[in-house]
Amino acid sequence: MFFREVFWEVDLMKRFALEKLIEWKDKQNRKPLIIRGARQVGKTWLMKEFGRTCFEKVAYVNFDNNKRLEQVFEGDINIDRILLAISIETGVSIDAKNTLLIFDEVQEVPKALSSLKYFCENAPEYAIVAAGSLLGVALHKGTSFPVGKVDFMDLYPLTFLEFLYALGEERFANVLQSDDTDMITMFKTKYIERLREYYYVGGMPEVVKTYVNSKDFKQVREIQKNLLNYYRQDFSKHAEVSLVPRLNLVWDSIPMQLAKENKKYIYGQVSKGSRAKDFELALQWLLDCGLIHKVQRVGKVVLPLKAYLDLDAFKVYLLDIGLLIAMTDLDAQVIIDGNRIFTEFKGALTEQYVLQQLIASEGIEPYYYSTSNSSGEIDFMIQGKTSIIPLEVKAEENLRAKSLKAFCEKYHPKYAVRTSMSDYREQEWMTNIPLYNIYKIREYADK
């Protein structure tokens, strides 16, 4: 993977997403780009940094509470009129070759979102990126969407690798991306130390920035709690009044659902006696906002996995491991040093970490597998180019993989992976990848 250097005030940070934006800029038949992601994952910063590093000029507009710009989009869409208004609003002389147009919080003005269709059809030479934290929710309210006229990119919290770069440990991160397993194993203790820090801090940009600048876990927790409060405020501000209590119940139930040995989401554990129909809308709202991830069960081990989903069985994870730990009020020392009474939930946190890395760093959509009676569960199933890869997650150096071995004996997959704190290990039927280098699973998916 390649990176471009970007700066967080005085701190060096690198994000994979910037390279994706550069690829989009250079793409033939480029369409306006919509960046999707939860609130506070860094969409605004990324768009501005993209403009700063790749364009001569940036015309940035935020549609949140901007009545003047809202009026510009009333009536028929006129591209020249819109460009003139944005130029006046921002003080930027706009030209197609050298200017990046940024539409932030675009869901606040539905016709601004609709205008992307007209830019695509009538003015494709202009580079436009748009973002909105609650875009999915806005669409459910009937906002007209420019179907087929936009490109998409998803943004997530920082990955573990990006976390290392944010800490200024560039050479350390570069080694992790190499194929030098001996060198990686040599520094295993340090990788595990940093990984446990990442478990607590997570990847929300403001939280990472706070940790990089202060190394103070108390300040980290304060920022995390603030973010969690912001999300609850969004529930009250943007959801239907009748849905808000259910959103809070579903949100609060996530740590409890993950703490179960069988992590299948059970509606009855959200509220006593409740059923799917009571909380399906709340769950979908959180999905649309990017605040949770939903991992579906597959009932067959055949390609394509998506054709064999069990729609009634799924697991739910939070968008960020640091926020998950903040919701449980676990102290930093429990995570960093380990604790004998913190063994059961450690498995849930490790699954959360692995899922987050698979989705954010590699764009992998994982599933999980279990038999009808929920025995012999495989934590994640990954669809590769020509094969299905079972992935078993272990929190420590546990080399046992009973479920994975039974699965392999039954289905004989081309590749099988266990990820744990143990070193690289190739066995006849399985490969162990260290948790801190789970990115390497992409090599198997691409084979």
Label the predicted regions.
Residues 2, 6, 139-260:
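Interdomain motor-coupling "hinge/lid" segment immediately C-terminal to the ATP-binding subdomain
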Residues 46, 50:
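Hydrophobic positions on the alpha1 helix immediately C-terminal to the Walker A/P-loop
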Residues 43:
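Conserved lysine of the Walker
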Residues 102, 127-133, 154:
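Structural recognition of the conserved hydrophobic beta-strand(s) that form the central parallel beta-sheet
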Residues 209-377, 382-383:
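Accessory nucleic acid-recognition modules appended to NTPase machines
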Residues 358, 378-397, 416:
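Conserved catalytic cores of phosphodiester-cleaving nucleases, focusing on short active-site segments
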Residues 65-97:
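Short glycine-rich substrate-engagement loop in P-loop NTPases that contacts/grips substrate
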Residues 14-28:
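Pre-Walker A adenine-sensing motif
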